Amino acid sequence: MTNCTFRAAVPGDEALILDFIHQLAIYERMDDQVVATPELLTEWIFEKQKAEVVFAEVDGQPVGFTLFFHNFSTFLGRAGIYLEDLFVLPEHRGKGYGKALLNNLARIAVERGCGRLEWSCLDWNKPSIDFYTKRMQAIPMDEWTVYRLTGDTLLAAANDI
């Protein structure tokens, strides 16, 4: 791996973040679902500070990114970090940057006293699953199912009090 450095996103990086989000969405076959805008990223990442972004850079050029936020484990009684997005540009894959990004995020979790680092992976994404289980030695949480409310169902639930 060539001189990989990490840089936290700052205001002005919104277009770069959005570009990574779009490229990840294309890889995940979900590009039609991206509605994020630079303005929304400014609001939620930089103004409200609800998520953080770290870029992996080589010679000052971004090659990958992570977007993450804190969650909380009632069982552990402490915060954890939830990795929402991890993406390495196709031309830079297989060079250790994904592992470096995850290791960097693990370091952040340990420094902040977090009890765990977790994320989700699409069940068809065998290259990522193999990477997580073999290279990172992550444990799949097969007994859990993710549930989600969005759009009209979220509004209906909010109004059904």
Where are these regions (language model features)?
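Conserved GNAT acetyl-CoA-binding A-motif
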Residues: 110-120
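Conserved acetyl-CoA pyrophosphate-binding loop and the N-cap/start of the following alpha-helix
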Residues: 92, 96-104
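A short beta-loop-alpha structural element at the N-terminal edge
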Residues: 5-19
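A short helix-loop-beta-strand connector motif used in the catalytic cores of GNAT acetyltransferases and
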Residues: 43-55, 82
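Conserved GNAT-fold acetyl-CoA-binding loop/helix
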Residues: 18-43
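Conserved beta-strand-loop-alpha-helix junction that forms the acyl-donor binding cleft
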Residues: 119-128, 148-150
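Conserved beta-strand in the GNAT
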Residues: 53-55, 61-70
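Conserved active-site alpha-helix within GNAT-family acetyltransferase domains
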Residues: 99, 123-143
